[in-house]
């Protein structure tokens, strides 16, 4: 996303962002990682501006205090409808296999509470399968979607009435990894980036970070 100010100044694609102010919540955030990878691919320099909260970033982008930001489509699309913010590219073009979310636990649980951890993953994976079948593949039709929205609304957007929460729940639908599988190449890439930015110790290895014995590993 870019501000209207940047858009009117000629920013039409990510390659036009050289020297621009790119909003992040904080150093090391997914926003920082995505912006950094995009900048490296386009061979440009960005000035990263930490603003802590998403609401603050949206306000700064609308007012032109920052030039660009990246956010999930179900938030980006409504923001782009008002004219003060424009969509100019897709993160997936730069990180096509980006593992943005994982299931994680303490090393004690992974090492010493194996049955508990495996049972959680089994239950979690069943929930993911039900969610994908209903919300993405629509195997139960509109009635199934509505039933799932009712269930999700008990925990998400609870401050909104159901009719106002439903569009956000539906628009935020995404396919999660089957069986909580891990794209190890993506995780390695992220770990190396954290090291290059001085955000984690150089001594940390992929085996420190990932227990590969629990789920399917995608390399």
Label the model's feature ranges.
Residues 1-10, 99-115:
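A bilobed periplasmic-binding-protein/Venus flytrap-type ligand-binding module shared by bacterial periplasmic
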Residues 1-81, 185:
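Bilobed "Venus flytrap"/periplasmic-binding protein-like clamshell domains
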Residues 17, 97-100:
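Short, solvent-exposed loop/turn segments at the edges of secondary structure
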Residues 21, 26, 39-42, 65, ...:
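Sec/Tat-exported extracytoplasmic proteins
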Residues 78-92, 163:
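Ligand-binding "clamshell"
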Residues 111-201:
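Secondary-structure end/capping motifs
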Residues 195-219:
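Long, low-complexity C-terminal extensions of enzymes
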């Amino acid at each position: 996303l870019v501000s209207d100010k940047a858009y009117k100044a000629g920013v039409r694609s990510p390659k036009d962002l050289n020297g621009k102010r790119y909003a992040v919540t904080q150093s090391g955030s997914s926003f920082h990682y995505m912006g950094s990878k995009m900048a490296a691919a386009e061979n440009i320099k960005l000035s990263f501006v930490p603003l802590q909260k998403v609401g603050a970033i949206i306000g700064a982008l609308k007012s032109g205090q920052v030039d660009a930001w990246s956010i999930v489509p179900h938030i980006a699309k409504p923001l782009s409808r008002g004219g003060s913010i424009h969509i100019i590219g897709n993160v997936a073009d730069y990180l096509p296999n980006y593992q943005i979310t994982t299931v994680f636990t303490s090393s004690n649980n992974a090492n010493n509470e194996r049955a508990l951890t495996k049972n959680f993953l089994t239950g979690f994976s069943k929930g993911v399968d039900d969610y994908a079948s209903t919300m993405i593949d629509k195997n139960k039709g509109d009635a199934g979607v509505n039933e799932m929205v009712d269930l999700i609304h008990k925990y998400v957007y609870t401050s909104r009435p159901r009719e106002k929460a439903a569009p956000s729940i539906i628009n935020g639908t995404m396919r999660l990894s089957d069986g909580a599988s891990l794209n190890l190449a993506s995780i390695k890439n992220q770990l190396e980036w954290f090291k290059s930015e001085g955000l984690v110790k150089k001594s940390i290895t992929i085996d420190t970070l990932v227990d590969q014995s629990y789920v399917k590993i995608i390399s």
